[in-house]
């Protein structure tokens, strides 16, 4: 039977875990390895499926594939706002809607606040940060998914009433994470690498100004995508760049095309 009374229990340097119930050396070794792997995931901010203090319920393999994309969509939706977020609505569409997707909402909240607060945002503290910041977040499902078998939609609402909606999907045999819609307009951009976002009123020559300044600074553009701007509405240009864009250059680019920008 496990020890129930020891002076070691009172030491701050000692972390006590529940009795593993492993009756053989091999079982104890495997159980210990599993615990160590879970600790490493938690320290890296990754999702720990068997953690007792994470909300969201059981996470199946299919849902787990979407966790990182949900985080990125939450971060992007928050960046597109020009005021503090007060609500975040996450909707799983298509085949994904048949799964338990509560954890995807949690991951999106984590992404949203990772671009706002200075402290690390984890699956454990994300709900408490949301509560302290007055954020109302929800998770819903819809059977319909435009152009994809499954898609994840994240809508952020700002205190001033402005909204930002981004949609992502896992595409191809390798399940490549992509951003497929921003504010109702289609695009096709990998959700990876270092990206420069510009929200501006599209005009002839604007794209050339942006590319020219980046080229003059020796910054290579690996990929680019531009939303289809509706008449009188702003466009969103996404540039995946090889290196970080200095703040002064980012400001100069934004001013040259009358844009709001972020990386």
Residue ranges of predicted features:
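Rossmann-like dinucleotide-binding domain for NAD(H)/NADP(H)
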Residues: 1-80
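A conserved regulatory-domain signal marking ACT and ACT-like small-molecule sensing domains
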Residues: 56-263
